[in-house]
Swiss-Prot record:
E.C. number(s) listed in UniProt: 1.2.1.41
GO cellular component, one term: cytoplasm
UniProt entry tagged with the keyword Amino-acid biosynthesis: yes
Family (UniProt): Belongs to the gamma-glutamyl phosphate reductase family.
Record lineage: Bacteria, Bacillati, Cyanobacteriota, Cyanophyceae, Synechococcales
GO biological process: one example: L-proline biosynthetic process
Annotated metabolic or biological route of this protein: Amino-acid biosynthesis; L-proline biosynthesis; L-glutamate 5-semialdehyde from L-glutamate: step 2/2
Compartments where located: Cytoplasm
Native species: Synechococcus sp. (strain CC9902)
Protein name, UniProt field: Gamma-glutamyl phosphate reductase
Keywords: Amino-acid biosynthesis, Cytoplasm, NADP, Oxidoreductase, Proline biosynthesis
InterPro entries: Ald_DH/histidinol_DH (IPR016161), Ald_DH_C (IPR016163), Ald_DH_N (IPR016162), Aldehyde_DH_dom (IPR015590), G-glutamylP_reductase_CS (IPR020593), Glu-5-SA_DH (IPR012134), GPR_dom (IPR000965)
Keyword Amino-acid biosynthesis: yes
Catalytic activity: L-glutamate 5-semialdehyde + phosphate + NADP(+) = L-glutamyl 5-phosphate + NADPH + H(+)
Length: 437
């Protein structure tokens, strides 16, 4: 961690303020946090024109600087996208309270009762690129789950991020809110984002949302636990028993509905026995949607124009480019996914339920789907209200991370003068009786 400087005195002070506010926030009740979220949504609504105008500034500057088209798509926050984010805040406010849930209730002995209760993590630090709507999502989930948040967005979204954060903090400052605005803070410089990595003791979890390089750098340069994913190299496998028309429709949606998203497919795998019929329908459909296809020799003989190179199989294009490969069978498809995939989201299209079940069991990704678009890998679409990120790690939380990924638990033990010596000496014995939750 020699490349990461010590945090500045100013950053330490800001992080300390967030920590103190988070302690108070963690003691609020469900109604208080819900009212605070509605106040945040109201403030965003009232300032929506200012936020959209700030986003136009960011878009114009980024276009002039030659920002990649995939990042430009993520950067855009128009009125429709902003309204969806505001609606998401209200949705989060209506979700069941994630705090204070009793997960375990056990009598260890008479008048000695153990409970396991859900509690906030404390303070989360989130580093993300280009996505200003992520500020809204993350802030709302943090407040709902009783956590403070330090957020660092990409410099390309600076004006938008500041306008959004100003609105969120203004909402928390309203009379109807019992949550301190200090629970949320926006970091704006590279020095602050590097300093964030050294805030162990003040920050409990770091969530990176961005490129593989960003995630790897953070994982290698902090002692704070990191939750996140790097690449989203998602696959769609068209089985021999697929319905061609259904498969074409789902495959096109999985690529083109929002190609800059991490849950868009990057590689299409097609069973050899259906390749001729499927590609005859799919290639024109993809071409009509503006998708560039890069394939192996067999798929090129069936209409794919460009040749795929070895690096294409492991590339997250985040654009209208798709790799295509013809495979012998399900085993070849799953082996390809194991070798090149990023354990994000994989899809099988088939009318054979037994084959689908084998795929769902064999593929070790955060999401495995049967006969539906990969684009459903999203916290809002899962009914989480929003997501703080997507985790491709094996340990939980995994996949789209909503409120459940921002809470931990605490053991509470209530006794009446009980001492361990009595049990060690055999004067008392444990009953270990589970009680109703």
């Amino acid at each position: 961690m020699n490349t990461v400087p010590e945090p500045s005195a100013e950053l330490l002070a800001r992080a300390g303020a967030v920590r103190l506010a988070a302690v108070e926030l963690g003691q609020t009740n469900n109604g208080q946090r819900s009212r605070a979220l509605h106040a945040m949504a109201d403030a965003l609504q009232e300032r929506s024109s200012l936020i959209v105008a700030a986003n136009v500034q960011d878009l114009e500057r980024s276009e002039a600087e030659g920002l990649a088209s995939a990042l430009m798509a993520r950067l855009k926050l128009d009125a429709t996208k902003l309204q969806a984010a505001i609606d998401g805040v209200r949705k989060v406010a209506s979700l069941p309270d994630p705090l204070g849930l009793r997960q375990l209730h056990r009598e260890l002995d008479t008048d000695l009762v153990l409970e396991r209760i859900t509690v906030p993590l404390g303070v989360v630090g989130v580093i993300f690129e280009a996505r200003p709507d992520a500020v809204v999502q993350i802030a709302s989930l943090a407040i709902r789950s009783g956590n403070g948040a330090l957020l660092k967005g990409g410099s390309e979204a600076r004006c938008t991020n500041e306008a959004v954060m100003d609105a969120l903090r203004a909402g928390l400052a309203r009379e109807e809110s019992d949550v301190s605005p200090d629970a949320l803070a926006l970091l704006t410089t590279r020095e602050e984002s590097l300093g964030l990595l050294r805030l162990d003791g003040l920050v409990d979890l770091i969530i990176p949302r961005g490129s593989n390089e960003l995630v790897r750098f953070i994982q290698d340069n902090t002692r704070i636990p990191v939750l996140g994913h790097a690449d989203g190299v998602c696959h769609l496998y068209v089985d021999a028993a697929a319905d061609v028309m259904k498969a074409t429709r789902v495959a096109v949606d999985s690529k083109t509905q929002y190609p800059a998203a991490c849950n868009a497919i990057e590689t299409l795998l097609v069973h050899r026995s259906i390749a001729t019929a499927f590609l005859a329908a799919a290639v024109p459909a993809f071409q009509a949607a503006g998708v560039t296809l890069r394939g192996d020799a067999e798929s090129q003989s069936l209409g794919v124009n460009e040749s795929a190179q070895e690096e294409d199989w492991s590339t997250e294009y985040l654009d209208l480019t798709l790799s295509v490969r013809v495979v012998d069978d399900l085993a070849c498809a799953t082996e390809h996914i194991r070798r090149y995939g990023s354990r994000h989201t994989e899809v099988i299209l088939t009318e054979d339920l037994a084959t689908a079940d084998r795929f769902l069991a064999a593929v070790d990704s955060a999401g495995v789907y049967h006969n539906c678009s990969s684009r459903f890998a999203d916290g809002f679409r899962y009914g989480f209200g929003a997501e703080v990120g997507i985790s491709t790690q094996t340990l939980p939380p995994r996949g789209p991370v909503g409120l459940e990924g921002l809470v931990t638990y605490r053991y509470r033990l209530r006794g009446n003068g009980h001492i361990a010596a009595d049990y060690a000496a055999g004067r008392r014995s444990f009953t270990h009786q589970d009680l109703p939750l």
